[in-house]
Structures are given as C-alpha cells and as structure tokens.
C-alpha cells in the first residue's frame, strides 16, 4: 500500500529558482508515493482535468477496481490534452505562462513596495506559485484592511479567513495572501494609480 500522497500545487510556476523534484519522482516508479495534480492552474480552470501517477505495484489493483469507471471529463477532451502534451505544446505554453506571471508578480511587488513606507511591508513566497504573502508591520484590523482593498477594486484573501481559533476579522492582519491570478486591472497598471 502507498504511504504518501503528493499534491503538486503550482509546481509549474517557479520563477527565480529551479523546480523542486517531486517526491514521486525521487521515490521511483514503484515507490510509496501517489502523485496528484491538475491542469486547472496551468491551462484553465474550466478544463477540469486532474491526474494521478500511481506506483507500478498499484496499477493492477487500480485497473481491476476502476476499469469500467467513466470520468466526468469526455474522452475527446482527454485525448486533446494528451496530444497537446505529447506534441510539446504544453511545455511551450507553460514557458509563456511563466513569463507572463513573472511579469505580473514583478509589477505587483513593485506596486506594493511603492505603496508602503520602507519597513512597513515584507513580501514572501515570491519565487513560486501564483500567490505571495504580504506581511504588514502595523496592520489595521483584518476587516478594515479587507474593506479598504475592496474599495480600491482589489480582492484579497486574508489568512485569518482560514483561522480556526475564531479571532477572525477583529485580529490585526499581519499577513494577507495576494494572488496573481486576479480578474481585474492588470498589475502593471496598479503603479499608475
């Protein structure tokens, strides 16, 4: 039986560093890791194709149990994606996406750094993924920060939204999560506001 499950979230978007090897790749074809991923961030959320790479020793059991299973994604979409990948188009697409998202990230970090006094803001998580963390030194209460950002047309996901202690919106917001996959004014225009 497998012992580890790896969800390779945003691994294809590393900007200033080399990609990390997957646990499944390091463990080998028959290692104890089941690798899970999706195309929703790298291609489009609407495609809704996820995949898993099973260790070889689990393949017979998988085929026996799920050979008649019909997924929710049509065979046409699956085969189209397979040809997109095997034809090298996916690799080229990811290279273009990395350049585009790196430019967005750079514009966003420049705009954020310009908007705060030195020492008031520290950004982390810049080297990978489609998000970053903004550490605010003298942060207003979470609800006030969220309202001010929304008034400017900026959608923030605050880490306190995921706080299980219940302190939520009354606590200071030392951290907020900013995603580069927004559907609003492009980041390069933020600095002009």
Language-model regions: role of each:
Residues 63-66, 87-109, 139:
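Structural signature of PLP-dependent enzymes
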Residues 8-10:
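Conserved Walker B
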Residues 99-109, 121-135, 145-148:
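Conserved glycine-rich beta-strand-loop-beta hairpin in the small C-terminal domain of fold type I
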Residues 151, 167-193:
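PLP-dependent enzyme catalytic core of the Aspartate aminotransferase-like
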Residues 26-61:
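Active-site PLP attachment segment
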Residues 1-2:
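Short, small-residue-biased leader/transition segments that mark boundaries at the very start
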Residues 57-77:
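Active-site C-terminal subdomain of aminotransferase-like
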């Amino acid at each position: 039986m497998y012992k580890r499950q790896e969800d390779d979230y945003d691994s294809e978007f590393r900007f200033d560093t080399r990609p990390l090897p997957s646990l499944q790749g390091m463990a080998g074809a028959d290692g104890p890791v089941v690798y899970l991923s999706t195309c929703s961030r790298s291609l489009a959320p609407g495609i809704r194709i996820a995949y898993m790479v099973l260790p070889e020793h689990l393949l017979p059991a998988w085929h026996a149990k799920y050979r008649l299973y019909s997924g929710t994604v049509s065979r046409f979409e699956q085969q189209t994606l397979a040809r997109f990948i095997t034809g090298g188009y996916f690799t080229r697409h990811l290279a273009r996406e990395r350049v585009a998202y790196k430019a967005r990230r750079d514009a966003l970090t420049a705009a954020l750094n310009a908007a705060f006094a030195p020492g008031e803001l520290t950004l982390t998580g810049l080297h990978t993924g489609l998000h970053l963390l903004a550490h605010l030194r003298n942060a207003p209460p979470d609800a006030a920060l969220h309202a001010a950002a929304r008034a400017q047309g900026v959608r923030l996901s605050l880490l306190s939204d995921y706080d299980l202690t219940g302190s939520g919106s009354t606590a200071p917001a030392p951290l907020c999560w900013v995603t580069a996959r927004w559907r609003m004014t492009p980041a390069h225009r933020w600095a002009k506001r």
